[in-house]
Amino acid sequence: MDKIKMTTPLVEMDGDEMTRILWKIIKDELLLPFIDLNTEYYDLGLEHRNETDDQVTVDSANATKKYGVAVKCATITPNAARMTEYNLKEMWKSPNGTIRAMLDGTVFRAPIVVKGIEPCVKNWKKPITIARHAYGDVYKASEMKIPGPGKCELVYTAEDGTETRELIHNFTGAGVVQGQHNLNDSIESFARSCFSYALSTRQDLWFATKDTISKKYDHTFKDIFQEIFDAEYKEKFEEAGITYFYTLIDDAVARVMKAEGGFIWACKNYDGDVMSDMVATAFGSLSMMTSVLVSPNGYYEYEAAH
C-alpha cells in the first residue's frame, strides 16, 4: 500500500509522562503505517525545557509560524513540588501559555458528541463550543511575595519618561501581589476570530466578563467586542440569522446550565481554561474534546484537551 506523502513538515511537540508513551503508540499504530510522516521534532518534556532554559518552547512556536501546523502533547507546568522532583533551575512558565502568546490565537474547544454518552446536564442537546482567548492575563502575569509592611503600586513609564501610578495596596503585613496585562491588538484578533467562527458555523456567540467589577481591564474586552461587532459583523450576523450576546460571567454560567447548547461561548483566558473543562466533563469526558489554537495569521496548533 502506498503511503500518503507529506510535502510540508508538521511541527511535533512531545510532552511529559504518559503522553510521550501514548503519542508514540498513536504514531506507530495509526500514522506511520499509512503516512510517510514528515515532522520537525521538539521535545517539550520538562527535563529538556530545563536543560535549554525553556528555549525549546520558543523554538517550537517559531517553527509553527514557519510551517503553519503543529501537534502538541500535554506538558507539565511545574509547581514547588515539581521544582524539587526534577531539580529545576527555576519554576518554568506554562509551555501552552508561551506558545499561545507567541501565536496570539484563539483556542476553540468543542465536545465530541456520540450516541451512548449522555451529557450530565440533561437539557444539553447540542455541543457548546468554548472560544478561549489565548494571550495574557494570569498566564503571562508577574508575581511577587510581599515580605512585610509597605506600599505596592502599578507604574506605567511612557516613552518620554513620564510616569503614571496607581496604588494597589498598602500592606500592613506579608502578602502576595500579581500584575496582569493584555493587548488591544490581541483582544481585537480574539474578537474577530470568534465572530468569524460563529459565522462559518452559523452559531450564536456569547461573550462574558466581569466588567462591573473590573471597570478598566474587563470593560476593555467588552468595549472592543462591541465596537468590532457593530462596525464589521452586525449586518452579517443578521443575514445569517444568528446573534451576539454579552453578559456577566456569573450570569453566563447560570444561563449555560439552562441552555440547550448549540452556541459558541467566548471567554477570557482563565475563564476559558476552567469552563472548557467543566463543559467537557459534563458532556462526557475531557478526552472527548477537540482543541485547536487558531491564529489570525493562519497558524494552527492542535493539542489534547487537558
Where are the regions that the model predicts?
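N-terminal alpha-helical transmembrane segments of multi-pass membrane transport
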Residues: D2-T8, M18-W23, D28-T52, A61-T64
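N-terminal glycine-rich phosphate/adenylate-binding segment common to multiple enzyme folds
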Residues: E47-E159, E163, Y270-V274
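Glycine-rich phosphate/diphosphate-binding loop of Rossmann-like nucleotide-binding domains
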Residues: M6-I25, E29, L154-T247
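Active-site rim loops that border cofactor/substrate pockets in soluble metabolic enzymes
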Residues: D43-L46, D218-W265, V274, G298-Y300
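Short acidic, glycine/serine/threonine-rich loops at helix termini
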Residues: L22-K24, R82-E85, K140-K145, K216-F221, ...
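Glycine-rich phosphate/nucleotide-binding loop
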Residues: V256-H306
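Short coil/turn connectors at secondary-structure junctions
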Residues: K5-T8, L37, K65-V69, I117, ...
